[in-house]
Amino acid sequence: MTKYVYTFGGKTAEGKADMKNLLGGKGANLAEMCLLGLPVPAGLTITTECCTAYYANNCQLPAGLMDDVWKAMKNVENIMGMKYDDPENPLLVSCRSGARSSMPGMMDTVLNIGLSSKTIPGLIKKTGNPRFVYDSYRRLVMMYADVVMEKSEGIEPADGKGIRKQLDDMLDEFKAKRGYKSDTEITADELKQLAEDFKKKVKEVLGTEFPDDAKAQMEGGIKAVFKSWNGKKAVSYRKIEGIPDDWGTAVNVQAMVFGNMGDTSATGVAFTRNPATGDNHFYGEWLINAQGEDVVAGIRTPSPLNDETKNEQNKNFHSMEELMPETYKELCDIRRTLEQNYHDMLDIEFTIQEGVLYMLQCRVGKRTGVAALNMAFDMLNEKLIDEQEVVMRISPAQLDELLHPILDAEDEKKYEVIAKGLPAGPGGAVGVIALTSEKAKFYAEQGIKNILVREETNPEDVEGMRAADGILTARGGMTSHAALVARGWGKCCIVGCDAVKIDFEKGFVYINGNVFKEGDLLALNGTKGYVYDKEIKMINATENPLFQRFMTMVDKFRTMGVRTNADNPDDALRAVSFGAEGIGLFRIEHMFYGKNSEKPLEKLRNMILSDSTDERIAALDELEPDIREYAKATLKVLDGKPLTFRLMDPPLHEFAPQGEEKMKEVAKRLKISYEEVKKRVDALHEVNPMMGLRGVRLGIIYPEITRVQFRALFSATAELMKEGHNPKLEIMVPLTINVKELEHQKNIATEIKAEVEAKYGVTISYMFGTMIEIPRATLVADKIAEVAEFFSFGTNDLTQMTFGFSRDDVNAIVKDYVDQKIIPADPFNTLDQEGVGQLVKLGVDRGRSTRANLKCGVCGEHGGDPDSVEFFYHAGLNYVSCSPFRVPVARLAAAQAAIKESRKK
């Protein structure tokens, strides 16, 4: 029989840290802390496998599960010295989620389970603190009604206002009538009455009585946590983070300890190092006489843990170090123990119950890219990790974040700071105000940069937070939901900016006397916590010496090459500065677009609209010097690094004049009638041009087009050689389907090369290869490799041809397919490893069966996608090629793939 329940507590546990796939991150780490001898309230973990079984069984708990839970609860009761559902000495528990990958705030939690009319009197008698008991009870009613009775049952509030919001409004109204500013001012009798009023409201709104049976509460809590795995916010977060839907969540049932028992009790969240900067200081926040949700939800601005955590908002609050020095020292000792054990920065939650410290959670903490880099090198110096682990510690997304723009410091100096908050997320952002998650998504879809402005964010805002360019909240600390999520995404974010007041009904934002409406502009400096009302210039982040050191370290472990897709000398230079080892895709057709393209485009159109081979050759002869100089400039910049030149690929109609005015200009230049030009342009039209006369087919039907390109390329190479340079030319024939096409083009190359060598008196060395873009080419790759010296997989077209998807028309279809889980991801962003990936592997294997030293690369956009890069590494490719700004990410992904492989040996 499958074991679904694992116990922990009393310095023993059935699990450990490396069991997070089964126990979830929270359950595995609770077990590990017990094994380390740390003070952890006892509990039990229901496995992720049980969650999978729950969904497979039509949302029914597996037979016998609750019997196993009650057996495990005996162990909890023995360790804690209390008994669940006991009228004299009641044990209360929490039900919390715990996926294998951290999903902060995305799933549900219920605290204080076990309070009922049967257990309340006994707890009052035991604690002598009726206020604490009724405060805990009203919290249970609020959470349970929200999580178990409404969300878990799939009840959608008619007016959009859920039961939790209605109960929160009742609480705010209650305090306002009495002039109370804080929950802690409410008396025991008032809390008792509030709880009763809450239960009446729950019955009125949800049509069901709040359960007064402790065992029913427990089962309801467990089911609700499992159901929250498929809640809207959890599904959205998983989609953003790429977390598989079939992982499931564990459920942790843990004995409650209370931070709301008075002034010797508290709750807090801390990081063993600063998650925004990486500084090696204990960093955290705490609240006296509160429960953990108060800190994480950002409902109250918390106090600092120590002097290092003090800021403008909390500098006058007493730190834990000041008020509870002995407990703080104990927490510092735990910090050291955890870092020595995990060799990483940890995010921890703790509760102090009447002076006694308990650890409720530890997990590897989310951090900004800058913090990740600083921590990794600090831990290397501290001998906690080695160089290999430094490379593994920085995710491709964090590396990408380090290249993100920031506010221009010189421009920033010109403007007045209108408000200051806590710098929770890095970099800068400039955009219009969005007051709701929906508005942020709307702006993003329109391509409008925006700042999501909220009182505080909650997990329901996750899609808007992702869509926004920056986040600004009025409340909350550095450990609030907004701060945690923003840091994880490298999103510019300022929290706890108490100068911000929002009137949602009128759609106004008030900041220190300034009035703004939705759509007005703000600028954020997320590194300093500054808010501006002016459009400030954005610049690329200043080069960090640590970044350069890190990339050097990355290249020590990388075995696969990284090139760039570039079409001009400027792009080539930029890519080389990012570490590109050459150009894997140089597209000649880009010389006919944009800057300085008018004259070359005129000549190309003369060729396209020619009426005979002689006319076409004459037009191409005029074009040859332009192609030669265009290629020569980039070959010169690369000097010694390879340039892979793709012969002209697009269908000719793309370059034809469009519209009557343009056609008349061409007619005048060619001295023919407008009608004749229109007739020739119309003749170029194809029903399906992407599968028509393009690529190698152009060079076979019109060999003069191939000749002019070869002559230009060989001449550029010869001239550079004579000037003392070291050009490394690779010529790539696109869209081949068999070896005969390549033989045809290679014969032309051999003929032209001999002519150019004779003219310049040099011997030209170059490589001749092909782009593998059509599925048939992978099947006959062994034959193609008889002529081709290298393959470059054009995965954009290979994906298009394999799926039968048109890249230009399929966006909506792909989105629906991903949403309905018909395919796991957009195959144009992340390589389809089951289909397209297998064709790549087949092409590599068959090609090398003929030519053992066949060089293989990829030049589609997948070359910059980390997951795809790892696949290409295992497929045996020599290099990937991607856009210039993706080069550092591809270098890191290639190094991490090599390290993972080495660790398997």
What are the residue ranges of the model-derived segments?
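A short, small-residue-rich loop immediately preceding and capping a beta-strand
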Residues: D469-R475, C493, G857
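Nucleotide/phosphate-binding sheet-loop regions of phosphoryl- and nucleotidyl-transfer enzymes
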Residues: M1-Y415, P423, K441-F442, I448-I451, ...
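Structural motif
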Residues: N252, A434, I451-V453, L472, ...
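Conserved alpha/beta-domain cores
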Residues: R96-S97, E543-P545, M553-K905
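Internal gly/pro-rich beta-alpha loop/helix module
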Residues: F504-Y510
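Short beta->alpha connector loops at strand-helix junctions that form conserved
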Residues: L44, A474-G476, V495-D498, F586, ...
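Extended, non-globular alpha-helical segments
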Residues: K420-E460, I511-R549
